[in-house]
């Protein structure tokens, strides 16, 4: 369902939620709430999107959904939602840097087992770190953002094929071009990991759509590349890989109400 700022769109979303509830025969009175994970920076009060260039959803408001659903509702930035899931999956972590390797790149900072929001809600927006001022044009209007090198879209554009076709070819190790494209991707990723680790001395979590495609060999390559480029060693055990793929933000968003319920018991 493609986003559009129309009553028809919000009605359709509400209808699909109702259909889902009916299909799986959930008891409505036991539904804790509905979390909507979306691309775009959410306002501090959670009432709407205040920056949404990718989806052009800056007019999206929480009330667009809550007025059509009989449940508590909340909006959450997809990258922050992904971080909630990684926190849930890694109870041993106090702090971390999350790379959300989705169609568009995202990120989040975890400190003291909380997702850091920042004064204006854009803490952890690592996709707009500039790694080459003469690089490709980013959707934000600047050049050389990490988005243009390490998003799934950037990888697919470089390869000219979808990720689901790229990785089987890569693992065959028969195409020097495919191997080089992946090596370039990992080099840019390692560059960003190195710099962020100097700011946040904590494990790095590779999460989202591309994460399940990473192998032990890839993690070893990243760790070795980091060792040669940084004054401090980031052991490969400090590079964690998420397992929930493209559904990471959706699951993480839902956990808000699950955790709230557990704490109320």
Residues covered by each model-derived region:
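Adenine-nucleotide phosphate-binding core of ATP-dependent small-molecule kinases
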Residues: 5-27, 148-149, 154-216, 241-242, ...
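Glycine-rich phosphate-binding loop and adjoining helix at the ATP-binding site
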Residues: 2-22, 30-95, 216-228
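General small-molecule cofactor/ligand-binding pocket signal
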Residues: 74-76, 238-242
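Glycine/GP-enriched mid-protein hinge/lid loop-to-helix segment characteristic of carbohydrate kinases
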Residues: 2-9, 63, 68-176
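Short, active-site-adjacent cap segments at secondary-structure transitions
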Residues: 40-44, 81-83, 106-107, 116, ...
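Charged, glycine-enriched surface loops/patches
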Residues: 226-239
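Nucleotide/phosphate-binding catalytic cleft detector across ATP-hydrolyzing
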Residues: 263-265
């Amino acid at each position: 369902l493609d986003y559009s700022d129309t009553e028809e769109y919000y009605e359709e979303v509400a209808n699909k939620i109702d259909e889902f509830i009916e299909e799986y025969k959930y008891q409505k009175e036991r539904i804790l709430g509905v979390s909507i994970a979306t691309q775009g920076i959410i306002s501090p009060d959670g009432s709407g999107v205040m920056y949404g260039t990718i989806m052009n959803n800056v007019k999206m408001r929480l009330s667009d959904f809550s007025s059509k659903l009989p449940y508590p509702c909340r909006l959450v930035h997809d990258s922050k939602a992904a971080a909630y899931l990684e926190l849930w999956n890694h109870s041993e972590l106090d702090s971390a840097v999350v790379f959300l390797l989705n169609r568009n790149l995202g990120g989040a900072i975890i400190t003291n087992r909380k997702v850091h929001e920042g004064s204006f809600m854009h803490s952890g927006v690592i996709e707009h770190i500039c790694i080459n001022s003469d690089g490709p044009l980013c959707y934000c209007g600047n050049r050389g953002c990490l988005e243009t090198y390490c998003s799934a879209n950037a990888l697919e554009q470089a390869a000219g094929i979808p990720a689901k076709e790229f990785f089987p070819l890569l693992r065959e190790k028969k195409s020097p071009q495919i191997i080089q494209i992946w090596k370039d991707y990992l080099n840019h990723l390692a560059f960003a990991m190195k710099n962020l680790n100097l700011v946040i001395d904590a494990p790095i979590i590779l999460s989202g759509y591309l994460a399940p495609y990473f192998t032990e060999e890839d993690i070893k390559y990243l760790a070795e590349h980091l060792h040669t480029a940084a004054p401090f060693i980031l052991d490969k055990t400090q590079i964690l890989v998420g397992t929930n793929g493209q559904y990471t933000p959706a699951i993480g968003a839902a956990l808000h109400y699950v955790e709230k319920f557990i704490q109320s018991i």
